[in-house]
């Protein structure tokens, strides 16, 4: 049986990546620090996924096990040495923390003279996730290790899309997911050309698809979340039942379409993007999914990043002299976001009290364009509570 190592036994790992790997006949080693999840994976070697639709379909995922990387790093290294594919779904901020362990696994492959190619695919909400992970892994490799890596190890970037709300069940392994899913892999950077996962789309130019997903799904979801939080709604579904918030989402989508068409006209057509955005609205409005605003709005400082879901489109729309007012509007609401259970939300509000606004905007967004900084300052003051 083919072997997969997957970092992150959370909801996306089990509810999306695990499902695809299982359907493709992989024996999956989930790597995580959650003791109860790892124990259950090793006890049962299977779990169930529920599809959040009117049919309430159930999918069984089998041939799974767990390794606690903080308690048993050697077992992770051993698993990487024998793996046919390695994937992650742990969050962009956590990738640097698994780099050393992956490096040791690759060094073991080299020591054991493993010449079968291995692709390492970061399934994260970021542009260039696998590339970023490769940089972090390379920090722990010697020159001869890097030579081995260049011959046998691939880091193809990927785009993943599936809504998996925060949830709690008696069964710690059970996870509910939306029916829609999309996983796109950059085929041009694959080392193992023989593994083609069913249920995955392969392309030789991933960037337009990553941007379409990030600027449409991530930006759109966050636009609904911060607008809903500003008006006091607790769930995405509640927020979208407010016509004002639905119209805000549509206005953000319109700006996104303008940017995607300006950049990627050879890949996308206006009518196709309109249908894609209408599908996203129906996904966000799925009555079977109760998605907390706090989940979608969490880590506001990260979401204000230079290459993130609002600042990057604003920069690129500005460069092309296209409208970005609705994206800008959401940035103002992010700075007004309060959540006493979110460390970044607390930190942002504390920074607002003690830091000059232009300096804070520059620090958080990475912007140096004074026109954009001034515009953000105005919108922050507008939404200040």
UniProtKB/Swiss-Prot annotation:
Keywords: NAD, Oxidoreductase. It is an enzyme of class 1 (oxidoreductase). It catalyses: D-mannitol 1-phosphate + NAD(+) = beta-D-fructose 6-phosphate + NADH + H(+). GO terms for cellular component: cytosol. NAD(+) binds at residues 4-15. Signal peptide: none annotated. Its EC number is 1.1.1.17. The keyword NAD applies. HAMAP family: Mannitol_dehydrog (MF_00196). Belongs to the mannitol dehydrogenase family. This is Mannitol-1-phosphate 5-dehydrogenase. It comes from Lactococcus lactis subsp. lactis (strain IL1403) (Streptococcus lactis). The lineage of its organism: Bacteria, Bacillati, Bacillota, Bacilli, Lactobacillales.
